[in-house]
A protein has these predicted regions:
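N-terminal secretory signal peptides
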Residues: 1-5, 26-27
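Flexible, glycine/charged-enriched surface loops at secondary-structure junctions
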Residues: 58, 81-83, 266-274, 331-342, ...
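Intrinsically disordered, low-complexity Ser/Thr/Pro/Gly-rich interaction regions
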Residues: 315-466, 473
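Hydrophobic alpha-helical packing residues
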Residues: 175, 179-182, 228, 325-328, ...
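Conserved acidic/glycine
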Residues: 9-11, 18-19, 424, 435, ...
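Membrane-embedded hairpin module used as a gating/binding unit in multi-pass transport
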Residues: 286-330
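N-terminal core-entry segment
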Residues: 9-19, 24-305, 484, 488, ...
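Amphipathic alpha-helical segments within well-ordered protein domains
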Residues: 47-48, 154-155, 207-208, 326, ...
Length: 497
């Protein structure tokens, strides 16, 4: 066996190991790549041909919750440390007179850069919704943050064209559905080996929403997908830094550029998804055709497996444990001084993503299980204020962090990587040990938030930036009855100074 054969065999074994039971392409010869002829065209036809009336009422209602959530997070994120930096950048561009609103401010910008700014704001606090995976072979059972790449460009285009609430919902659902099915289909190695799916797959969602609103035909939409595949990017190693929200904001803007070019006659590959040298192969080493071929809207992803709306502005993987910590604190009236130590057992993949074990900034705190549990013990809450730099650097917080042992637990490891198994033990100084276990958090499809609960989260985001109460209530009511909104610019007025 020569070196080439050895290399090919080792790649094939790696692909088999990463596939975990699903049939994905090995990164060997093109002949081994799954055949899904016409896949990109099928996606484009879905975008072009789907009507508002095709979306079930319960799916529309689920979308309203995520849309309201996204608007609130854009408000809160406008007050983040990244907000002024993004606005300074956008202002320096000085592009054109046709401009869309930057939420939480009085600024307007070209659609592309308004989408970027609002996308960064939505993801700035890592508080936005999360797509659940249908397959069992996905780490944590999670895939993307679906709304951040889709809502900003859809909102910007609807505002400028004075589109209706129904137009906004249709574009939003096109984008989310396309993004999520692509994320479901690509081989797990895409995320396992470092890609940030919100940046990569989210770009397709942005293009789908924009193509729908711009009225592109099937061929133009195929080209737009070809362009946006080239634009998308993002890496997990940037988690805990400003560049994670950048990757989300970049996904939001990517679709606007791709669709602008396609509308002008720009060409690209018309089979970028399924081609042996296209997206699925180049960025994932393969894909599962059964996860996407014939599956768009069957069922809608928002319906099944669904999305989670976050209860805290931190990484999703921390939330089951945080829910259990709060439950035990309230049930036992635990005081910080009573705590000897805390053990939190999880699978190895959770420790890989919640990678900041001694955080010193708010951004790092979002990806620190030790911090998330410590701040709950000390303050009994973990909202936007608790993830500011000053909160993380408090002396009592840093001291409590030292008492938290975040470790790989064999029981959690054996439970599988498709869930966020969190095994909690709080050791008190009197010798008592309080125990809890959770796999899902509040806001997940198994324990969903109601519209009113999402509205309360929205109010918290608005209060964080001292948004006027009347405007806050207007947005809540507008989104609740979005099908009756005659002009989306009315919502923009309530979200800007």
């Amino acid at each position: 066996m020569n070196r080439r054969d050895l290399f090919k065999n080792s790649l094939a074994m790696s692909a088999l190991a990463l596939g975990r039971g699903h049939i994905y392409a090995s990164p060997g010869p093109a002949a081994e790549f799954p055949k899904a002829p016409g896949l990109t065209k099928y996606v484009a036809e879905f975008i072009v041909n789907t009507k508002y009336e095709d979306i079930p009422a319960d799916v529309l209602d689920l979308g309203k919750k995520s849309i309201l959530d996204g608007f609130g997070l854009a408000l809160a994120g406008s007050g983040s440390v990244m907000g002024p930096l993004v606005r300074q950048y956008v202002q320096s561009l000085g592009l054109g007179d046709v401009k869309a609103s930057i939420i939480g401010t009085g600024m307007k910008a070209h659609t592309r850069f308004a989408s970027f700014a609002n996308g960064v704001s939505i993801h700035a606090d890592d508080y936005d919704d999360t797509q659940l995976a249908g397959a069992k072979d996905r780490i944590y059972g999670l895939l993307t943050h679906p709304s951040v790449g889709v809502l900003p460009p859809a909102f910007a285009l609807c505002e400028l064209a004075h589109k209706t609430g129904k137009d906004l919902m249709l574009a939003y659902h096109m984008g989310v559905e396309v993004e999520c099915k692509i994320a479901e289909a690509i081989s797990p190695r895409h995320y396992d080996e470092g890609f940030h799916t919100t940046g990569t797959c989210g770009s397709f969602g942005s293009a789908a929403a924009c193509a729908k609103l711009r009225g592109l035909n099937v061929a133009q939409t195929q080209y737009a997908l070809g362009v946006v595949a080239t634009e998308g990017g993002g890496f997990r190693n940037n988690f805990g830094s400003m560049t994670k929200p950048f990757q989300a904001g970049h996904a939001a803007e990517n679709g606007t550029l791709a669709v602008d070019l396609a509308a002008l006659g720009w060409t690209a590959s018309d089979n970028i998804l399924e081609a042996p040298l296209g997206f699925f192969q180049a960025e994932g080493g393969g894909f599962d055709p059964d996860a996407i071929v014939g599956r768009l809207s069957k069922p809608w992803t928002l319906e099944s497996p669904g999305v989670s709306i976050k209860p805290h502005p931190s990484g999703s993987l921390s939330h089951p444990a945080m829910g259990e910590m709060l439950r035990l604190i309230h049930e036992n009236d635990i005081k910080p001084g009573e705590v000897e130590k805390v053990d939190l057992g999880a699978n190895h993949a959770m420790l890989t993503s919640l990678l900041h074990h001694r955080p010193t900034t708010g951004l790092q705190g979002k990806f620190s299980m030790e911090y998330c549990l410590s701040i709950l013990l000390l303050d009994r809450r973990a909202g936007l204020i608790e993830f500011q730099d000053a909160s993380v650097r408090r002396a009592d917080v840093q001291e409590m962090i030292k008492r938290v042992n975040f470790y790989i637990d064999p029981e959690a490891e054996n439970a599988g990587l498709d869930k966020m198994t969190s095994i909690l033990r709080i050791h008190l100084k009197n010798g008592k040990v309080l125990s809890g276990r959770a796999e899902f958090a509040k806001g997940s499809p198994t324990n969903p938030m109601s519209y009113d609960e999402v509205a309360d989260k929205f109010r918290g985001c608005a209060d964080f930036v001292k948004w006027p109460a009347a405007k806050t209530q207007s947005v809540i009511q507008f989104v609740k009855t979005l099908e009756n909104v005659s002009d989306v610019s009315k919502i923009a007025a309530a979200l800007t100074v």
